[in-house]
């Protein structure tokens, strides 16, 4: 998808600058059509992430030769149908080849850099036994951030050295409940096969996997049926079987971040324009224009969340008295005709303008354009392991709940079901679809109060 943008840019620039009196979009459509044909004929995505820089150069050359051959053939057949000159065509081929090579090289570099950063930021819980632990070295070249360890055949007294290294010790009988409260991205299970039955490892994997936490099992361990997907990869130098409810295409994850950054920049520009007129109206009661609050993001990370203030300054204190009138069933608060909402607040909520400052959260990387809604800290602290699954993805400004008539949903479990459906079925195309449907909902003024 990103390569298509490069092709379109190269074609637009060369055709506009070099071709005399160029006005036809037909040539641009022709260029893109050939790109898609050549893209698949040349098997452009095969071994994309494992190709070195020399192999990438060869692949771009192969793509370009295919492009020249097919284009020349079609130009010959339909020679009177296009305004493109030979000079503009070969200039396009040269520019397109250079930009494609640079783009693909950058994507690989970014992936390598982001994976290294991701590894350092990844919070891992180790589940092991004493013998396996003695053969491991913590905080080595792999840089994963171990935050806790559960030693299945040891008591807490045996773990003094680990405590000294700031590792939290988890009792095996409270493993699931403690992981529900911790910020955890992955679990690494490293014990011999013969101990699997004794410590009910399959049940442990299923419980952790159900939270949306990735589970890595040393590949020497027994492979068995799990509730999600699994694949063999490396972790800390071991070959492991990795269990997850779903594995996502890395190209789609990059596209999602690219979409987030682009959308956030546009959104912040709109936010700045709106703020010029809106801020004085909000501040008429003497309070701040921006409401900020700690919210819970991916896998339990706490971040500062921003909105245009639509409620009284003392709204959080009054909320305690209004909890008895909560219209939601479960761990979320909603009240029609909420007395805390200000006069201007009713308007900005109805039009969803209050959400605009969250584009800053998206740009920072705390949130995404599309995802699940971030809960408050007090709501999160009451989650069970199944409900925590909705936090296995970055929270978003919009999502399935927002386009599914959110004012008609009063059961929190129904919201969790929609969030899990989004996570299970996610692709970049589903995000684009939700964004388009959100624009429709906002323009029609439905779904928000």
UniProtKB/Swiss-Prot annotation:
GO cellular component: plasma membrane
Pfam name, any one: Bac_transf
Topological relation to the membrane, as annotated: Multi-pass membrane protein
Primary subcellular site in the record, as a coarse category: membrane
Example GO BP: polysaccharide biosynthetic process
EC number annotated for this UniProt entry: 2.7.8.-
Enzyme class, UniProt record, top EC level: transferase
Keywords, ordered alphabetically: Capsule biogenesis/degradation, Cell membrane, Exopolysaccharide synthesis, Membrane, Transferase, Transmembrane, Transmembrane helix, Virulence
Transmembrane segments: 5-22, 27-46, 59-78, 88-107, 258-280
Origin superkingdom: Bacteria
UniProt cross-references to InterPro entries, sorted A to Z: Bact_transf, EPS_sugar_tfrase
Protein's cellular compartments: Cell membrane
Single GO molecular function: phosphotransferase activity, for other substituted phosphate groups
Family affiliation: Belongs to the bacterial sugar transferase family.
Function noted in UniProt: Galactosyl transferase is essential for the assembly of the group B streptococci (GBS) type III capsular polysaccharide. May be involved in the formation of either or both galactosidic bonds by catalyzing the addition of galactose to an oligosaccharide precursor or to a lipid intermediate. Type III capsular polysaccharide consists of a linear backbone with short side chains ending in residues of N-acetylneuraminic acid or sialic acid.
Protein name in the entry: Galactosyl transferase CpsE
Annotated organism of origin: Streptococcus agalactiae serotype V (strain ATCC BAA-611 / 2603 V/R)
Gene (UniProt): cpsE
């Amino acid at each position: 998808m990103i390569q298509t943008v490069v092709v379109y840019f190269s074609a637009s620039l060369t055709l506009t600058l070099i071709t005399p009196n160029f006005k036809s979009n037909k040539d641009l459509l022709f260029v893109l059509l050939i790109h898609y044909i050549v893209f698949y004929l040349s098997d452009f995505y095969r071994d994309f992430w494992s190709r070195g820089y020399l192999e990438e150069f060869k692949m771009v050359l192969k793509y370009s030769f295919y492009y020249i051959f097919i284009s020349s053939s079609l130009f010959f057949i339909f020679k009177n149908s296009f305004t493109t000159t030979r000079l503009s065509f070969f200039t396009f081929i040269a520019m397109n080849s250079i930009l494609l090579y640079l783009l693909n090289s950058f994507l690989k570099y970014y992936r390598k850099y982001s994976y290294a950063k991701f590894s350092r930021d990844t919070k891992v819980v180790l589940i092991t036994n004493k013998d396996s632990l003695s053969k491991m070295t913590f905080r080595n070249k792999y840089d994963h951030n171990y935050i806790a360890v559960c030693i299945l055949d040891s008591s807490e007294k045996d773990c003094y050295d680990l405590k000294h290294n700031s590792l939290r010790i988890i009792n095996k009988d409270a493993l699931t409940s403690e992981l529900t409260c911790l910020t955890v991205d992955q679990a690494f299970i490293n014990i011999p096969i013969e101990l699997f039955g004794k410590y009910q490892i399959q049940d442990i994997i299923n419980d952790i996997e159900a939270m949306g936490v990735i589970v890595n099992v040393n590949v020497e361990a027994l492979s068995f049926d799990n509730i999600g997907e699994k694949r063999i990869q490396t972790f800390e130098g071991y070959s492991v079987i990795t269990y997850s409810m779903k594995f996502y295409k890395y190209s789609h994850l990059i596209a999602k971040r690219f979409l987030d950054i682009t959308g956030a920049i546009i959104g912040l520009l709109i936010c700045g324009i709106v703020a010029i007129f809106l801020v004085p109206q909000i501040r008429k009661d003497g309070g701040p224009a921006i409401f900020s609050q700690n919210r819970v993001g991916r896998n339990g990370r706490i971040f500062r969340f921003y909105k245009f203030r639509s409620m009284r300054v003392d709204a959080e204190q009054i909320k305690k008295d209004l909890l008895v009138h909560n219209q939601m069933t479960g761990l979320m608060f909603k009240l029609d005709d909420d007395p805390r909402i200000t006069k201007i607040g009713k308007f900005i909520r109805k039009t969803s303008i209050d959400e605009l400052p969250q584009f800053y959260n998206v740009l920072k990387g705390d949130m995404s354009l599309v995802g699940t809604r971030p809960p408050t800290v007090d709501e999160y602290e009451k989650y069970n392991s199944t409900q925590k699954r909705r936090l296995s993805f970055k929270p978003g400004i919009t999502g399935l709940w927002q386009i599914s008539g959110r004012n008609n949903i009063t059961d929190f479990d129904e919201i969790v079901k929609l969030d899990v459906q989004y996570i299970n079925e996610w692709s970049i195309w589903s995000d684009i679809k939700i964004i388009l449907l959100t624009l429709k909902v906002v323009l029609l003024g439905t779904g928000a109060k």
